[in-house]
């Protein structure tokens, strides 16, 4: 959801990364399908 909601602002990757960090991951990014992908 973070990738779609903020895609127009450029903040979508930051929101995705923050979401992943909160889940204990090392960050994340939005893929080509606007899905937030967390790094392990």
Swiss-Prot record:
Induction context: By bacterial infection.
InterPro entries cross-referenced by the UniProt entry: Defensin_insect, Defensin_invertebrate/fungal, Scorpion_toxin-like_sf
Location within or outside the cell: Secreted
Cysteines engaged in disulfide bonds, as pairs: 3-30, 16-36, 20-38
Chief subcellular location: secreted
Presence of keyword Flavoprotein: no
Pfam families: Defensin_2 (PF01097)
GO cellular component, one term: extracellular space
Keywords: Antibiotic, Antimicrobial, Defensin, Disulfide bond, Fungicide, Immunity, Innate immunity, Secreted
Leader peptide range in chain numbering: none
Keyword Hydrolase: no
BP terms from Gene Ontology: defense response to fungus; defense response to Gram-positive bacterium; humoral immune response; innate immune response; killing of cells of another organism
Family according to the record: Belongs to the invertebrate defensin family. Type 1 subfamily.
Function description: Antimicrobial peptide mostly active against Gram-positive bacteria. Active against Gram-positive bacterium M.luteus and also against fungus N.crassa. Has no activity against Gram-negative bacterium E.coli. Active against M.luteus and, weakly, against E.coli.
Note: At least 3 isoforms with masses ranging from 4032 kDa to 4114 kDa seem to exist.
Full protein name: Defensin
Originating species: Calliphora vicina (Blue blowfly)
Lineage: Eukaryota, Metazoa, Ecdysozoa, Arthropoda, Hexapoda
